[in-house]
């Protein structure tokens, strides 16, 4: 913020004409005698912490006014003091807050924002009558006083013991996934080793799933047909999961106007990692989650207690986060991503806690379905935890009984976010680092900020809202799946995706030309049964065809020669049951193969293979 403070005999103004960002006001003219006139330009940096810049500006104005023994203050917006202006919405709020704070001890006149104004001023002309000041968002000692402190515990749900984490506890931990998550939370750095790229980065390129798009911004991907199929199947999976549990799908914009106070305040809580830009005189942002559109939609709804809990779901395609370039890592951390996002409106905390528990189990189910085990951490403010210990311990006990695992508990001394409780579930990658995926959060702020109300008789109640991503971003889910596939190789298992997610579930390879007609019949039977099957008709050796099927992670490789045609039994290599150098082969009829694959994919979403059936016709994308 830039300010120009003038000790004035008087300041007089008249608002002449509106601009596009003019505030609504009845104060179109005014005059104040014997005053301190404060010309103010709100800058972009002020948006990172509006409360701090208001506090610091008020302190500076009070100090100057007291030195000059002045009791009258004019707050005058003056954009010409800076070439790096903040958004109009931020400026209006900051100026209004400054006026409000000063009004406790001074007579204050504030000129309207966003109007062309004429003004007359008489400067007293003494050595302290003209002062310029740059106001920053520095909080000085206040930050230290208000710092929220965390304590971490290991919770054994069966015994319901809480053990505070220390070096001895860390040294004794046997659950490697939970230990990796705990070290990440405690910011314990491992000894530096030459690791290179995570395995999933190699896989996404080698398997023609996706790749960096060099002509876009860093952290944006192009998706090839196989990758698009996987992403669509994952999206279908989450859609079915939430709709079965009462979620109502919606779609909202990806771009929002920061002049809306609620939008800006919610965006500011996320910090600087946003795509923001100015277009047509408006300060705009690209969403980093579906909160904005869903909250604006809920604000316009006429909600009654009987409607609750009310769940709105959106597959946020895309969401954007301006991560630092040096932090961008494959599908784990990127700038444009697909986020399944459900928000649940709850009447009160009791209903919110019931929904939280339901959504915890829903999130854990996704790990079961993907075969990617999670480590989990609960996070609660001290007050919330003290009030709801019995509920938490019952939930932790059920988790231990179902999964046989301990969990981490973080207790925060106060609230530093919009939530009072949350749970995060993480896959651990091949480098021993967590990939946080599903999350559930109890939000106690946003309903009031966005004006969301429930009509309960004559009362209007601000509800509690749960944020839930049942899987985390689709890209991170795939990241976890691929990292888990690599970890399988360390246990002498071939890397693979779950059958329902594998682009090519079955490949039929004829030994010779005379076997092609029968092989095509088999392929067509598989495809007509909803199985993604292709046919390797390339002019290559049998050995290379089988190796290619392995490279493509085909779940079932069917070889057809004389004996298969004569017996009607197919020789099938089953990838999931094989070892790295010891393929597991079975003799199955076409019907038995169809039944085997169908049993593995029962209840899972299905889509056809988006590639030509014949391998010779499938293009190479990279």
Curated annotation (Swiss-Prot):
EC number assigned by the record: 6.1.1.3
Disulfide-bonded cysteines: none
Cofactor annotation: Zn(2+)
Example GO biological process: threonyl-tRNA aminoacylation
Entry-linked SUPFAM superfamilies: Class II aaRS ABD-related (SSF52954), Class II aaRS and biotin synthetases (SSF55681)
Region ranges (Editing domain): 1-136
PROSITE patterns (alphabetical): AA_TRNA_LIGASE_II
Cofactor note (record): Binds 1 zinc ion per subunit.
Record localization: Cytoplasm
GO cellular component: cytoplasm
Superkingdom to which the source organism belongs: Archaea
UniProt feature coiled coil, ranges: none
GO MF term list: ATP binding; threonine-tRNA ligase activity; tRNA binding; zinc ion binding
InterPro entries: aa-tRNA-synt_IIb, aa-tRNA-synth_II, aa-tRNA-synth_II/BPL/LPL, Anticodon-bd, Anticodon-bd_dom_sf, DTD-like_sf, Thr-tRNA-ligase_IIa, Threonyl-tRNA_syn_edit_dom_arc
Keyword terms, alphabetized: Aminoacyl-tRNA synthetase, ATP-binding, Cytoplasm, Ligase, Metal-binding, Nucleotide-binding, Protein biosynthesis, RNA-binding, tRNA-binding, Zinc
Pfam families (alphabetical): HGTP_anticodon, tRNA-synt_2b, tRNA-Thr_ED
Family note: Belongs to the class-II aminoacyl-tRNA synthetase family.
Record's comment describing the protein's domains: The N-terminal domain is an archaea-specific tRNA-editing domain that hydrolyzes incorrectly charged L-seryl-tRNA(Thr). Catalysis of tRNA editing is performed by the charged tRNA itself.
Known function: Catalyzes the attachment of threonine to tRNA(Thr) in a two-step reaction: L-threonine is first activated by ATP to form Thr-AMP and then transferred to the acceptor end of tRNA(Thr). Also edits incorrectly charged L-seryl-tRNA(Thr).
Subunit structure and binding partners: Homodimer.
Name this protein carries in UniProt: Threonine--tRNA ligase
């Amino acid at each position: 913020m830039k300010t120009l403070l003038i000790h004035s005999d008087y300041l007089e103004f008249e608002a002449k004409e509106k601009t596009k960002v003019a505030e609504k006001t009845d104060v179109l003219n005014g005059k104040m005698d014997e005053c301190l006139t404060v010309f103010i330009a709100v800058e972009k940096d002020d948006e990172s912490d509006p409360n701090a810049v208001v506090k610091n500006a008020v302190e500076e104005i009070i100090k100057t006014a007291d030195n000059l023994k002045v009791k009258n203050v004019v707050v005058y917006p003056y954009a010409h003091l800076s070439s790096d202006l903040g958004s109009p919405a931020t400026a209006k709020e900051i100026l209004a807050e400054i006026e409000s704070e000063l009004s406790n001890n001074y007579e204050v006149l504030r000129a309207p924002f966003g109007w062309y104004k004429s003004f007359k001023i008489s400067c007293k002309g003494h050595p302290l009558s003209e002062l310029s000041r740059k106001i920053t968002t520095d909080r000085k000692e206040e930050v230290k006083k208000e710092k929220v402190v965390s304590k971490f515990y290991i919770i054994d749900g069966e015994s319901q013991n809480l053990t505070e984490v220390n070096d001895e506890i860390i040294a004794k931990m046997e659950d490697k996934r939970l230990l990796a998550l705990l070290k990440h939370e405690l910011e314990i750095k491992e000894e530096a080793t030459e690791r290179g790229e995570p395995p999933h980065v190699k896989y996404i390129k080698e398997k023609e799933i996706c790749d960096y798009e060099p002509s876009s911004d860093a952290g944006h991907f192009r998706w090839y047909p196989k990758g698009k199929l996987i992403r669509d199947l994952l999206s279908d999976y989450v859609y079915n999961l939430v709709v079965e549990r009462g979620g109502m799908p919606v779609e909202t914009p990806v771009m929002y106007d920061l002049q809306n106070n609620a939008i800006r305040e919610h965006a500011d809580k996320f910090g600087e990692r946003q795509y923001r830009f100015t277009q047509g005189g408006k300060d705009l942002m690209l969403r980093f989650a579906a909160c904005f559109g869903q909250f604006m939609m809920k604000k316009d709804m006429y909600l009654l207690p009987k409607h609750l809990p009310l769940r709105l779901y959106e597959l946020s395609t895309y969401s954007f986060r301006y991560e630092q370039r040096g932090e961008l890592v494959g599908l784990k951390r990127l700038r444009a991503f697909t986020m399944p996002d459900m928000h649940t409106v709850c009447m009160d905390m009791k209903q919110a806690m019931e929904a939280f528990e339901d959504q915890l189990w829903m999130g854990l189910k996704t790990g079961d379905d993907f075969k990617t085990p999670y480590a989990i951490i609960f996070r609660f403010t001290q007050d919330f935890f003290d009030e709801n210990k019995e509920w938490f311990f019952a939930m932790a006990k059920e988790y231990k009984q179902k999964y046989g695992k301990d969990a981490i508990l973080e207790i925060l001394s106060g609230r530093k976010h919009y939530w009072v409780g949350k749970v995060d579930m993480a896959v651990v990658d091949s480098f021993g680092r967590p990939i946080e995926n599903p999350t559930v959060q109890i939000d106690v702020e946003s309903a009031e900020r966005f004006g969301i109300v429930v009509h309960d008789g004559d009362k209007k109640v601000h509800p509690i809202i749960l944020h839930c991503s049942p899987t985390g971003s689709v890209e991170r889910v795939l990241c976890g799946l691929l990292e888990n596939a690599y970890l399988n190789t360390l246990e002498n298992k071939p890397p693979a995706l779950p059958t329902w997610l594998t682009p090519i579930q079955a490949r039929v390879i004829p030994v010779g030309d005379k076997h092609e007609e029968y092989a095509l019949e088999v392929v067509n039977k598989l495809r007509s049964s909803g199985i993604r099957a292709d046919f390797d008709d390339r002019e290559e050796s049998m050995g290379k065809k089988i190796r290619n099927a392995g490279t493509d992670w085909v779940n079932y490789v069917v070889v057809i020669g004389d004996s298969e045609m004569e017996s009607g039994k197919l020789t099938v290599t089953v990838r999931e049951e094989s070892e790295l150098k010891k393929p597991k082969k079975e003799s199955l009829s076409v019907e038995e193969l169809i039944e085997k694959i169908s049993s593995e994919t029962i209840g899972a979403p299905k889509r056809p293979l988006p590639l030509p059936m014949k391998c010779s016709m499938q293009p190479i994308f990279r």
